[in-house]
């Protein structure tokens, strides 16, 4: 997850969940938006534009995975 100001993570589970949801919304919106563009204009897009959109979708997917991996790692380290 994105480090909060001051570097301290919320200790309250509800606050942590709210931050996780917030951090996932941006890349998820990117995936949804570019996928819809590809779906609507699949025949009108040239290969370069289609490749750009697919690249952005892939990058957003990697960002979401990283956010979730970081959260999992943080939770596991708290259990130790």
Features from the language model and the residues they span:
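Conserved phosphoacceptor histidine of two-component systems
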Residues: 18-23
């Amino acid at each position: 997850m994105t480090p909060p100001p001051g570097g301290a993570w919320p200790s309250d589970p509800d606050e942590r969940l709210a931050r996780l949801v917030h951090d996932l919304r941006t890349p998820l919106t990117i995936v949804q938006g570019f996928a819809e563009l590809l779906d609507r204009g699949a025949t009108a897009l040239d290969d370069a534009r289609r490749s750009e959109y697919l690249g952005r979708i892939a990058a957003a997917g990697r960002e979401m995975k990283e956010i979730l991996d970081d959260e999992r790692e943080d939770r596991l380290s708290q259990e130790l």
